[in-house]
A protein has these predicted regions:
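Short alpha-helical "recognition helix" segments of helix-turn-helix
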Residues: 1, 57-60
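Short amphipathic alpha-helical segments
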Residues: 1-7
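Short, solvent-exposed alpha-helical "recognition" segments
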Residues: 10-15, 72-85
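Short, Lys/Arg-enriched anionic-surface-contact patches
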Residues: 12-18, 22-38
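Short Lys/Arg-enriched helix C-cap and helix-to-coil transition segments
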Residues: 16-21, 82-94
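Intrinsically disordered, low-complexity basic tails/linkers immediately adjacent to helix-turn-helix/homeobox/MYB/SANT
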Residues: 25-34, 88-110
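Short, amphipathic alpha-helical "recognition" segments used to contact nucleic acids or chromatin
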Residues: 34-51
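Short, basic interhelical loop/turn and adjoining N-cap
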Residues: 59-71
Length: 110
């Protein structure tokens, strides 16, 4: 645990607009007073928006300042595989929750 906290502290020094939080899929990095970095990634990478408009669109969609979105993007650039793993973990958790809900509905229907 001490090693994890030290690592997080060093990362926060390099990325001061971010903080670590506990969540249903484990520790994750998020903007201070903002969404998790993995949530922003979907609006920044890929999608139907031209690359030169993606930061501005994320600013609009999430109600953030440009420097916040750029801070999240900088963290993602440095720790891409970590954030991609969080995206995947959250996708899997959502699928499992949906499957459970469907099973509950089947049981209720008899």
């Amino acid at each position: 645990m001490a090693e994890e906290l030290l690592d997080e502290g060093l990362r926060i020094r390099r990325h001061p607009l971010l903080r670590f939080r506990d969540g249903p899929t484990g520790r994750r990095v998020a903007l201070v007073c903002g969404p998790d970095v993995w949530e922003l990634v979907g609006g920044l990478v890929g999608g139907d928006v031209a690359p030169d408009r993606r930061v501005e669109r994320a600013v609009e969609l999430f109600g953030l300042r440009r420097e916040q979105v750029e801070a999240a993007l900088a963290y993602y650039a440095e720790f891409t595989s970590e954030i991609d793993a969080q995206v995947e973990a959250n996708r899997q958790a959502a699928e499992e929750a949906e499957a459970l809900w469907h099973r509950q509905q089947e049981l209720l229907a008899g």
